[in-house]
Amino acid sequence: MPKYELEKRTNVWYNKNIQFGRKKGYKVERDNRIYIAIDLKSFYASVECVERGLDPLTTNLVVADAERTQKTICLAVSPSLKEYGIPGRARLFEVIEKVKEVNCARRMRAPGGIFQGESSDALELSASPKLSLTYITATPRMAYYMEYSTRIYNIYLKYVAPEDIHVYSVDEVFIDASGYLKTYGLTAKEFAVKMIKDVLDTTGITATAGIGTNLYLAKVAMDIVAKHVDADEDGVRIAELDEMSYRRILWNHTPLTDFWRIGRGYEHRLMECGIYTMGDIARCSVGKDGEYYNEELLYKM
């Protein structure tokens, strides 16, 4: 489903969930709903690592067509390679330059300033300064990634009805968990962990999750807050938000582009009006008609 259509379907989604809930003998009020957003970690890169029998969390790998120019965009960068400051959608020449920079620093720590080998494994590199950093370049296989995505979707179907799973992209879904927590006797976090662990055990791919009292909070919990949560032994990060914790944690968070659906252009227009944070936006939305900061200012953006 195109991302811009997700918000349009919220009311339809709610109505379907209520109907499904009645069939199952329960009804979850709209104010008490719980949503889980799940994002498969560096999905394309993880698939390529798994297919090579490698650990997706410790293998340095990029998904890119190396036969094109070095300006080609990497479709994915593995987590261990991101640790060197390489963004998820870097161009190939940026990866090459960063690896050169890292190896220059590593060479200074190598015995005699000479490398005695190379490795694309983060654990081996951490254990031995004698090795130079290298990485695997995997040619994109989009049809294969779609097959993996379908397999993972079918795993989710073991736990929830299709009416309650909403595919956001090839590697990301929203799940309305409201009617299932009581049935399974689990908290929202435990339920998320249960599904993610099943995906990991079945495919070797881990994930990050956000839990919220609405779609937006689940998404933001996953995109922003989970990044600051310690990962478990499987690399899983899960964060939760409700309306109050959102205000407490993210009211003053910057940059605004970290938030769902706020791009650089919109951020720039907001900043031109003296609006820099979500707290500023909220205060503007309740401003009175005679004040400079009021909701009309936001509507004109």
Predicted features and spans:
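Gly/Gly-Pro- and Ser/Thr-rich, intrinsically disordered tail segments characteristic of DNA damage-repair
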Residues: 13-301
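Cationic, low-complexity basic patches in intrinsically disordered or flexible, solvent-exposed regions
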Residues: 4-6, 20
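Gram-positive cell-envelope targeting signals
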Residues: 1-3, 14
